[in-house]
């Protein structure tokens, strides 16, 4: 073969790859252009952090890369709340294989790393969908790039591209579905097993929806299978089981930790409910429909206006048999119904109702719709020109009806009008195509492709890739690093082994500790220990289904949580409770006067008599102080007046003040003190005690709400004598640390009076406790914290954490992998024997 022939061969190979390459590059280019237009860093000062990407993913990614670079254990993290199992958190949020490339990323550019991965996944969606079309329909038509772009820039991706823990599954879904087709039709299992196992390992939650879809789609394939149906069922069950089992190394630890979270429990709906009418739902396939991420269940199902046209032509196409059409159209209709029906919605979402971010399976609806539309495109010659007119009339009627019965706040008139314009444009182009020569048809295809990609681009620009200020997110990082380093230096001068927690007065997220690398008592995570949230709420602190926060804690409770330092973005008022110890720029570090070590003794009587479930937050804290020896109420009521829009406290004595309030509709309360101080209390609807700070006699404290409603305030003054007494009772017997690491703690304690050694560590299955070298079954204090009964005398204490279920899961995963390899070997040997037998004949 001469050089010319070699060059021609290479050229042909590149030509064959061009549609797939275009399916990747077109979404990539569009996403980059939109980022430039939206002034995303480095093209401006914006970034793509949205919703959970802002509050969870960036902090968790930062903690992940810190652990990888420092060599710390991947089993446990102390920077996430009071401490958290990291294997389950990794499985839930970070398990994408692509995330390991974060090792190449400088720490200060984690945001950009996540943004690049977001854009990469969008582009890979286009590639894998185009690859599916190429293999499924045995075509390399350039149109696969256009349809791949439609999948990549769908409304689901516009709404949820920021949700980087989900999008690997969107990339893999076309390959998994192609794999199940190969499994049934060609008896090939490798693609199905590898892609499904990878999806399950990457994100079990979205994989549940893929698995439900696979079962339904498999039934269609089985109906179309003429012979070997039993074998197909066996293969599908066997390799699905192996794929699921391969994910056990992460699934089992994740399931155990989720069992202790706010996501535990299944409550199937008792009655059928329809969320909305189907016309309003399907109207969300129009262009410029605002993506929806709230709690009203609206799915994001736009995939291009052209699909509204092609799906009708699919129904009238004479080149596609009704035996093929009927089950696929029924599946599409079933999926559309699933968005509107509460029971089906519950099943699709893994036997849970989503807490916002609805219709999480809608990418599968978009997948199926685009596949049917592509098949229509391939068989356009089997349609007639008048079918276009019928489709035009039906689409017009649909638009009118959907507009009539849709919520104008969700789908505006501009959306319907623009959709109508595009429908007319596509109708005209199709009519020209039907009446044109082969050359004219080529031009029509080119023009239509440009129109489709333009439509998708404009919609994605208008509804996707929202931004926030990068500057405001990162501006304090260096100052935080400086003051935290000074805190470490101060502690290391006093002791070789130390433990303390730090909190912020003005936090960006409830996971700021993971962002800046310090230990805290606040977190926001779906894997959060729900018992900690419950005790926080019982004490008048901030807590919910997937978060708990130090807001509302008195100095006594803060001390029990080992909260030693407070970071403030502005200088705080003078107070006997804390001292300024460091500053950097506009960031200030204060040391609390009251802070206990990680472990401290509590009398049996206190643990037994403290009834923290039946009172309010203030009374429960007062009761604890009383049980610890306080002779007076720690938080005593002082006069306050409440009227519409404002509550007022006239300060008659120097002291530290708090306030509790009735229910409020405003999400923010503002404190104004007559000395000029101001403070904002966000998430006021969570109902926590307000820390009003130190005030002097004669000061006036006003608490205002933006909704101009009457909020009944009960004000309290902190009794320092009661606080001192309660604190000294706990501080009189504490554990001295001798070593501390991510998953192992050792210490000694000299117990003067038998009782319970309580740790400010959430009680979870992974902890093993040793007292004087003997394993001891840990108990629970306040239903949330690790507690160990101790007799009087000196004791050596050791706590070791091992992720529960990790070893069992690893063994199951390894076993399933071996079984797959053995199955593949056996299958290969069978095929070889068949070939040999045929050659002998």
Language model features by range: what are they?
Residues 11-85, 468-485, 493-510, 514:
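Hydrophobic alpha-helical membrane-insertion signals
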Residues 27-30, 118-136, 141-224, 235-260, ...:
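Membrane-embedded helix bundles of polyisoprenyl
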Residues 28-129, 149-170, 209, 258-263, ...:
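Membrane-interface coil-to-helix junctions
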Residues 51, 55-66, 97, 232-327, ...:
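Periplasmic/ER-lumenal interhelical loops and adjacent helix-loop junctions
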Residues 125-133, 172-184, 212-220, 308-315, ...:
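Transmembrane alpha-helical segments
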Residues 183, 187, 206, 326-346, ...:
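Contiguous transmembrane helix-bundle modules in multi-pass membrane proteins
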Residues 451-474, 488-560, 594-596, 601-626, ...:
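Extracytoplasmic/lumenal acceptor-recognition loop(s) of multi-pass membrane glycoenzymes
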């Amino acid at each position: 073969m001469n050089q010319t022939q070699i060059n021609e061969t290479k050229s042909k190979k590149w030509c064959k790859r061009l549609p797939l390459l275009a399916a990747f590059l077109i979404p990539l280019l569009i996403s980059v252009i939109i980022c430039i237009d939206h002034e995303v860093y480095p093209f401006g000062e914006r970034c793509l952090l949205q919703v959970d990407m802002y509050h969870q993913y960036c902090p968790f990614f930062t903690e992940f890369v810190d652990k990888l670079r420092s060599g710390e254990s991947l089993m446990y993290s102390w920077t996430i709340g009071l401490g958290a199992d990291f294997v389950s958190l990794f499985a839930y949020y970070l398990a994408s294989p692509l995330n390991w490339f974060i090792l190449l990323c400088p720490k200060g550019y984690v945001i950009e790393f996540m943004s690049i991965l977001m854009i990469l996944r969008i582009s890979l969606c286009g590639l894998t969908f185009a690859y599916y079309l190429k293999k499924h329909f045995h075509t390399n038509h350039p149109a696969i790039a256009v349809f791949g772009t439609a999948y990549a820039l769908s409304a689901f991706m516009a709404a949820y591209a920021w949700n980087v823990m989900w999008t690997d599954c969107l990339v893999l879904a076309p390959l998994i579905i192609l794999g199940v087709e190969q499994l049934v039709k060609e008896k090939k299992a490798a693609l199905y097993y590898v892609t499904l196992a990878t999806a399950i390992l990457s994100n079990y939650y979205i994989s549940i929806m893929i698995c439900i879809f696979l079962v339904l789609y498999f039934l269609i394939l089985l109906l179309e299978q003429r012979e070997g149906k039993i074998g197909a069922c066996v293969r599908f069950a066997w390799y699905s089981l192996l794929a699921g089992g391969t994910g056990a190394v992460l699934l089992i630890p994740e399931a155990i930790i989720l069992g202790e979270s706010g996501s535990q429990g299944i409550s199937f709906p008792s009655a059928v409910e329809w969320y909305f009418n189907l016309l309003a739902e399907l109207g969300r396939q129009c262009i410029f429909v605002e993506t929806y991420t709230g709690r009203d269940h609206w799915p994001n199902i736009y995939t291009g206006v052209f699909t509204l046209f092609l799906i009708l032509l699919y129904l009238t196409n004479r080149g596609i048999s009704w035996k093929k059409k009927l089950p696929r159209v029924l599946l599409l209709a079933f999926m559309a119904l699933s968005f509107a029906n509460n029971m089906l919605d519950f099943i699709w979402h893994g036997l849970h109702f989503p807490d916002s971010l609805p219709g999480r399976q809608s990418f599968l609806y978009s997948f199926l719709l685009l596949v049917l539309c592509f098949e229509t495109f391939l068989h356009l010659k089997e349609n007639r020109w008048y079918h276009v007119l019928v489709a035009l009339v039906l689409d017009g009627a649909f638009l009118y009806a959907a507009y009539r019965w849709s919520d104008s706040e969700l789908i505006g008139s501009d959306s319907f009008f623009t959709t109508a314009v595009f429908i007319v444009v596509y109708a005209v182009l199709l009519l020209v195509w039907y009446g044109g020569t082969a050359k004219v048809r080529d031009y029509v295809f080119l023009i239509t492709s440009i129109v489709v990609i333009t439509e998708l681009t404009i919609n994605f620009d208008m509804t996707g890739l929202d931004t926030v200020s990068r500057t405001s997110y990162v501006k304090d990082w260096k100052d935080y690093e400086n003051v935290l380093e000074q805190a470490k230096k101060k502690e290391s001068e006093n002791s070789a082994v130390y433990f303390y927690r730090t909190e912020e007065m003005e936090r960006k997220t409830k996971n700021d500790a993971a962002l800046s690398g310090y230990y805290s008592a606040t977190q926001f995570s779906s894997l959060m220990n729900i018992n900690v949230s419950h005790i926080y709420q019982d004490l008048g602190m901030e807590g919910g289904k997937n978060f708990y926060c130090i807001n509302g804690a008195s100095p006594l409770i803060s001390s029990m949580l080992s909260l030693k330092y407070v970071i403030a973005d502005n200088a705080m008022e003078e107070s006997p409770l804390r001292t300024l110890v460091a500053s950097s720029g506009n960031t200030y570090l204060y040391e609390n006067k009251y802070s206990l070590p990680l472990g401290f003794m509590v009398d049996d009587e206190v643990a037994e008599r403290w009834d923290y479930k039946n009172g309010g937050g203030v009374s429960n804290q007062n009761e604890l102080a009383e049980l610890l020896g306080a002779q007076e109420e720690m938080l005593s009521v002082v006069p306050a007046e409440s009227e519409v829009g404002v509550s007022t406290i006239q300060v008659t004595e120097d002291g530290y003040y708090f306030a509790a309030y009735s229910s409020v509709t405003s999400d923010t309360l503002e404190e104004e003190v007559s000395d000029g101080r101001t403070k904002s209390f966000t998430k006021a609807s969570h109902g926590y005690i307000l820390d009003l700070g130190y005030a002097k006699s004669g000061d006036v404290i006003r608490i205002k709400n933006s909704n101009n409603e009457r909020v009944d305030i009960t004000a309290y003054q902190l009794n320092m004598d009661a606080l001192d007494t309660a604190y000294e009772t706990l501080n009189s017997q504490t554990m001295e640390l001798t070593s501390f690491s991510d998953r192992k703690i050792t210490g000694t304690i000299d117990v003067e009076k038998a009782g319970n050694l309580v740790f400010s560590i959430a009680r979870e299955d992974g902890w093993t406790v040793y007292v004087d070298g003997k394993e001891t079954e840990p108990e629970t204090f306040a239903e949330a914290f690790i507690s160990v009964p101790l007799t009087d005398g000196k004791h050596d204490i050791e706590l070791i954490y091992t992720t529960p279920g990790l070893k069992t899961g690893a063994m199951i995963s390894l076993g399933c992998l071996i079984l797959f390899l053995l199955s593949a070997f056996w299958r290969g040997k069978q095929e070889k024997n068949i070939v040999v037998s045929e050659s002998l004949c």
